[in-house]
UniProtKB/Swiss-Prot annotation:
Family: Belongs to the GDT1 family.
Identification of the protein by name: GDT1-like protein 4
GO molecular function: metal ion transmembrane transporter activity
Primary location recorded for the protein, binned into one broad class: membrane
Keyword field: Membrane, Transmembrane, Transmembrane helix
A Pfam family recorded for this sequence: GDT1
Membrane topology: Multi-pass membrane protein
Transmembrane parts of this sequence: 12-32, 39-59, 71-91, 135-155, 175-195, 207-227
Localization, UniProt: Membrane
Stored PANTHER family: TRANSMEMBRANE PROTEIN 165, TRANSMEMBRANE PROTEIN HTP-1 RELATED
């Protein structure tokens, strides 16, 4: 088992480059323009923290189900696979434009029309709920909070970053992995919520993909060169 610091550092770097231009990053930026920022930030962060803890728990449990030697080899292959995947995406990208930002915005607009709600309608409904009994709970678990939570939680489910977190927690100290992941999620999500669409549109998906690919390859090489007890 590696040190907490090593798990923290690798998780922080991996999560940051995976999330800074991810779909959930763009979703947080767009939602923050339409709804109260504190509710969007709370919902997005809650979902990402829960997902990080779940992923790290799965990774921690993996060596107890199969041998640590096999989990180490699987993790190494995951790093190389995700590295090549990210590099391919990076080389395939055109310029610095954000096509994914436009896709996420279109999906959110479609969802908004399907529900027949506008941000103002949601705010009015929230104000009415506050006047009812259990005002504290309805304020905390507001429709906006739940919307931000669900979009980010299901957006991360089965994503490359989730699988990488599982693999990293199987090979590194799980506490360090969770801590590094949470710090990175906080930094990325806060930047998205504060910066909004203007910041998101300035991010080059190509540079992010190439940086993430190189980082995954480095992790793969380091994992390959690291001996592990059976």
């Amino acid at each position: 088992m590696s040190s907490v610091l090593q798990g923290f550092t690798k998780s922080l770097a991996m999560t940051f480059v995976s999330e800074i231009g991810d779909k959930t990053f763009f979703a947080a930026a767009i939602l923050a323009m339409r709804y109260p920022r504190r509710l969007v930030l709370a919902g997005c962060l809650s979902a990402l923290i829960v997902m990080t803890i779940l992923s790290a728990t799965l990774g921690w449990a993996a060596p107890n189900l199969i041998s640590r030697k096999w989990t180490h080899h699987i993790t190494t292959l995951l790093f190389f696979g995700f590295g090549l995947w990210s590099l391919w995406d990076g080389f395939k990208e055109g310029g610095g434009g954000s096509e994914e930002l436009a896709e996420v915005e279109a999906e959110l607009d479609a969802d908004l029309k399907a529900n027949g709600k506008s941000p103002k309608d949601s705010s009015k409904r929230e104000d009415e709920n506050k006047k009812q009994n259990r005002a504290f709970l309805t304020q905390f678990f507001s429709p906006i909070f739940l919307k931000a939570f669900s979009i980010n939680f299901f957006g991360e489910w089965g994503d490359k970053s989730q699988l990488a977190t599982i693999g990293l927690a199987a090979d590194e100290n799980p506490f360090g992995v969770v801590l590094g992941g949470v710090v990175a999620q906080f930094l990325c999500t806060t930047a998205a919520v504060i910066g909004g669409k203007s910041l998101a549109s300035q991010i080059s998906e190509r540079i992010v993909a190439l940086s993430g690919g190189m980082l995954f390859i480095i992790f793969g090489i380091q994992s390959y060169l690291t001996s592990v007890e059976a």
